[in-house]
A protein has these predicted regions:
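Residue-level signature of mid-helix packing/kink "hotspots" within the transmembrane helices
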Residues: 39, 67-75, 160, 271-279, ...
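Extracytoplasmic gate region of multi-pass secondary transporters
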Residues: 41-42, 227-275
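Interfacial helix-cap and linker-helix signal at transmembrane-aqueous boundaries
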Residues: 48-49, 80-81, 168-173, 253-254, ...
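Helix-to-loop junctions at the C-terminal end of transmembrane segments
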Residues: 73-85, 277-289, 373-374
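Structural signature of the two symmetry-related core transmembrane helices
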Residues: 88-102, 292-306
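Cytoplasmic helix-loop-helix junction between adjacent transmembrane helices
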Residues: 116-154
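Helix-loop-helix hairpin linking two adjacent transmembrane segments in secondary transporters
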Residues: 151-199
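A late C-terminal transmembrane helix in Major Facilitator Superfamily
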Residues: 345-375
């Protein structure tokens, strides 16, 4: 089952197909597993800093190895999936990411940590472009925003559980054995992905209806030239803010007197709020539009970070779910807008480019904010994070104007044809 097969229409009338539901569930499961693997690293960073005497900049570099490689391999993974098949690529990438955790558990030096993180980034690069394009192809048309919102929401489900479980395992059996256990979970997930997608019968599992040339279509040229770059820029800033904040949140909590169990609980609370934010903001984006939702989420993110800095540990923990709602809520709006800006035949590449930009920004931002933290301190660096996220607000306003102009032209075209 390849992306090409899933994205190619057949001209048949669309009808309910259990294959669509299976594709969505497998994509959601893969997203939850991979995001759980990725975000468990936040819990390990303070332990590595203590064991290997690392600076904030070095911590940022280690984090960037994983996310940077993951960003760089997004487009190649999507292209390779067209040859090998989506099932094999998703399962194989998951297995590689799991093996990386097994290697993390056996690492005795920073060099081995770096090798394991690079390997994990390669494995995790397969998930986003392949799963997103499969879901968008399976739920073509207006339903794609809701389906992609569900897929995006699923990524936070594992985040709500894995940090707390990992923190408990570290306290009981050490971080090395915990890494091994997480790797075994990943291998089991890889097998489940392969078996589940094999049950979907090749190209007949998902059918994308062909639109006739007479169907009303927006001005794709204008959307690609003007709208998609704006959306990508908003996504880059949003991702850089999220990854920068999450990377240094454990260190901020440490400075407030938090121990490892409290840090694990804090991450779980952020991710729980993030899951709720993705679900709620997906509905808000569909009802209110891009601009009001981005104004709400990004403004609340900046305000939440500013409020968090002076609070004691108890009040900080209570605030974190609210920050999580705002921190992750924007992404549901952004992911769901990609199909509105890109024609179906270019969607796989667009998702690859979008994820390359956003994940790449998430990889680079911890390094830059780490350098700032070493130079000016942790609190001023987090103040900078809060300031930069506000740059998304004028960009969202411009994107809304592009979308409104295209919608106006489409309505005018329809009115002329009626007359």
């Amino acid at each position: 089952m390849t992306i090409t097969a899933l994205s190619t229409g057949t001209g048949r009338a669309e009808h309910p197909d259990p294959g669509r539901t299976r594709v969505l569930w497998v994509a959601c499961g893969a997203h939850a597993l991979h995001d759980g693997l990725t975000d468990t690293l936040y819990l390990l960073l303070p332990l590595w800093q203590a064991q290997f005497a690392l600076s904030y900049a070095a911590i940022g570099i280690l984090r960037a190895l994983y996310t940077g490689v993951m960003a760089g391999f997004q487009v190649p993974a999507a292209k390779l999936a067209q040859r090998t098949g989506g099932a094999r690529m998703l399962a194989g990438g998951t297995a590689v990411a799991a093996v990386a955790y097994l290697l993390l558990g056996a690492s005795s030096s920073v060099a081995l940590l770096a090798v394991a993180l690079v390997l994990g980034g390669i494995g995790s690069s397969t998930q986003h472009p392949i799963a997103s394009s499969l879901v968008a192809a399976a739920y073509e048309g207006p339903r794609s925003r809701g389906a992609l919102g569900t897929y995006n929401f699923a990524g936070d489900l594992r985040k709500m559980a894995l940090p707390s479980i990992t923190a408990w395992l570290i306290a009981v059996i050490s971080w090395r054995w915990t890494g091994t256990a997480v790797g075994v979970i990943g291998l089991l997930g890889a097998g489940a992905i392969l078996l589940s997608l094999r049950a979907v019968t090749s190209a007949s599992a998902v059918r994308t209806p062909i639109r006739s040339e007479q169907d009303k279509a927006p001005d794709w040229t204008r959307l690609l030239r003007n709208g998609f770059p704006l959306l990508l820029t908003i996504g880059v800033i949003d991702s850089a803010t999220r990854m920068g904040f999450l990377t240094f949140l454990p260190f901020l909590l440490q400075s407030k007197g938090a121990g490892l169990p409290e840090i694990g609980l804090a991450l779980t609370m952020v991710f729980a709020g993030g899951a709720a934010g993705k679900l709620v903001c997906g509905f808000l984006g569909a009802r209110l539009g891009v601009l009001p939702t981005v104004l709400l989420t990004e403004g609340a993110t900046a305000a939440g970070i500013l409020a968090l800095l002076p609070l004691p540990i108890g009040a900080a923990l209570a605030l974190l779910p609210v920050i999580g709602v705002a921190l992750n809520g924007t992404s549901s709006v952004l992911y769901g807008t990609v199909p509105d800006l890109v024609p179906a035949d270019r969607r796989e590449s667009a998702f690859g480019v979008f994820y390359t930009g956003t994940i790449g920004a998430g990889a680079l931002s911890p390094v830059l904010y780490g350098l700032f933290s070493d130079a000016i301190g942790l609190t001023p660096a987090l103040l900078l994070v809060a300031a930069i996220v506000l740059m998304t607000l004028p960009l969202a306003w411009k994107l809304t104007r592009v979308l409104s102009a295209v919608a106006h032209d489409l309505r005018s075209q329809t009115a002329r044809e009626v007359l």
